[in-house]
Amino acid sequence: MELDRSAGWVVAFVGGRFSWEVVFVEGDVLVLVEGKEVLADGVVGLTLRAVGEDGLPSWEPGAHIDLVLGDGLIRQYSLCGDPRDAGTWRIGVLKEGPGSTFVHERVQVGDRLTARGPRNHFLLKEAPRYLFLAGGIGVTPILSMVAAAEAAGAEWRLLYGGRRRSAMAFLDELSVYGERVEIRPQDEFGLLDLEGALREVTSGTLVYCCGPEPMLAAAEECCGALGVGGLRTERFSPKAVEGVDEAFDVELALSGRTLRIEAGRSILETVEKAGVNVLSSCREGTCGTCETPVLDGEPDHRDSVLTEEERADGGFMMICVSRARGSRLVLEL
């Protein structure tokens, strides 16, 4: 791993599955809530500007940030503004759970918040064609993707579903794209016809899907049944996994220490207790912050970040949730 600590930021370039791309820009940045608006029923948007003259780190479509909220809450939100705007970040927040409730009810224009990132495990890859599938607040990372696809001159289509039209954010912004955006509220059209959309996918098309877990599971099932490759998903909640927790050993290659990971305790918890500092955030396998190189052994992947190809490669794992398939792992820690 190379670290560039210029300008107070830590930029990590990790060889392997990211092919030496920027994986994340990590550091605390103080942001001012410059704007707050209602985007839809139960959804508010925040516009954030850096406090001071340093500005905000750059980002690409698919990226998210952490917001440090009250009562020790840290939540991840997809950036949904224009990556070319170096002065502000924009996020959309669905009122669901204590973190988003805090944003809806207590965060006001003029407040200062701590943000971290951005990070991107849902990066928009270059392709001639795209199919975007969005459900509910899952449209937030997709919004900047369709703008990027349009700017690149690629063919694309967006299928966007929600419970009802009044609860679907960004409809006015998306209307400028005409028939390439299909708005399908459930109370008017029923469930999204994922199978129909995926049957039309041609070779070279990348499929990006973000939404509630049942929708993501259905998309994965349809792609498997139809033989559609190129599916990339992002989850806002942990993916259901099956497996029995058993104890195993982890060797920390940088220090030579070996730690016992007991059943019911994560690798992350164990190494933190042993005094090893590891970047982490969600602690449920959805954000990718704790991604760690695997030097030996076979991981039991339980995260919602890695693709099937990346899991099969076995070179990285999310140590907040994933475990070992055998009795021992060697990690670059």
Label the model's feature ranges.
Residues 63, 80-84, 263-268, 306-308, ...:
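A short, sequence-level motif marking secondary-structure junctions
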Residues 15-112, 116, 125, 162-164:
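Ferredoxin-reductase
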Residues 2-15, 100-254, 260:
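FNR/FR-type flavoprotein reductase catalytic core
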Residues 64, 111-112, 273, 289, ...:
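Residue-level marker of beta-strand positions
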Residues 246-279:
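C-terminal accessory/binding modules appended to enzymatic or scaffolding proteins
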Residues 65-67, 248-253, 290:
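Short polybasic amphipathic segments
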Residues 141, 276-303, 311-326:
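Local cysteine-cluster metal-coordination motifs and their immediate loop/turn environment
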Residues 187-189, 262, 323-333:
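Short flanking/linker segments adjacent to small metal-binding domains or redox-active Cys/His motifs
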